[in-house]
């Protein structure tokens, strides 16, 4: 039976998040969908071209409402605070409008990426209606804030944790993308918790042979490619030391496909160390083009900072990398490490040791082409 479904998300098309697929799937089942989101500005911090004003549009049975907010800008703490709060207040006002003037929704789904404020909206909506509420929890607060040193005060962390626990109590079910997160959620939430694993982007599964990208990559180099957000949680400081290790031999070339808060700082550090000649930054790339870019790669790179909460997280890009049939070079622990090792689809450095990582990459480079390709096929 078709339902009326209200979806809150911090990110939506043209921003590249899994919620885009979920909306398509739910919409294809004749459900009436309303997506409440903001003007896209992630990860560059600037509004996307042709998306600079609040607007609403209807596509068959899907309504999308883009609410106003202050863009992330350079990603500094003050700009992020303005970005978070401006969208939060826009959401609260719009939720009041929905509750008072719009026909009741049967289900509310919250796609939670930072900030957690997005998860508060069903509390307001439930003043007027009593829908089933689902939280797709992809970013565990306040631990994530603590892990990337955004908040260092233990008192503030404790306060935020109490707010999160209070908010959870309004949900009927929480969806998690990693089994490792279940124990964290169970300590706060007594209702239903369901494992909802990530999947490879449909564009990856439907690779077009017509896609052609020209990259000026030096010949006779082993190319390691990273795609996605270039942020603080990706542990790029360790990677700088690894890039430095290979600098004398000049046999590895690094390609970074994406954008993010840490990108400029990362490039600055590479330049200071005189390593920039071994790297290429493409900037933001539509996910549809990732398969074409990956054809230049001998291996795909994946990393997360060494932190308890990140060690229990399964990065969404892991499924994408596996679907690309490329060997994986990973710096992480936990569930992601287990998947890569058990599938024999690449190498993993779990001790946050750049020298160990460098030696493993060196061994990977020395593999016969057939064995290297087999790692990708295993994925």
Put a short name on every predicted segment.
Residues 234, 286-293, 298-322, 329-339:
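Nucleotide-sugar-dependent
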Residues 217-234, 240-243, 255, 376:
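Conserved donor-binding/catalytic core segment of Leloir-type glycosyltransferases
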Residues 257, 264-291:
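Nucleotide-activated donor-binding/catalytic signature segment of Leloir-type glycosyltransferases, i.e.
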Residues 39, 180, 198-199:
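Carbohydrate-associated surface elements
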Residues 117, 124-128, 154-174:
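Membrane-proximal helix-turn-helix segments that form the acceptor-binding/catalytic region
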Residues 1-58, 243-246:
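N-terminal subdomain of nucleotide-sugar transferases
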Residues 363, 370-379:
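A short, well-ordered alpha-helix in the C-terminal region of glycosyltransferases
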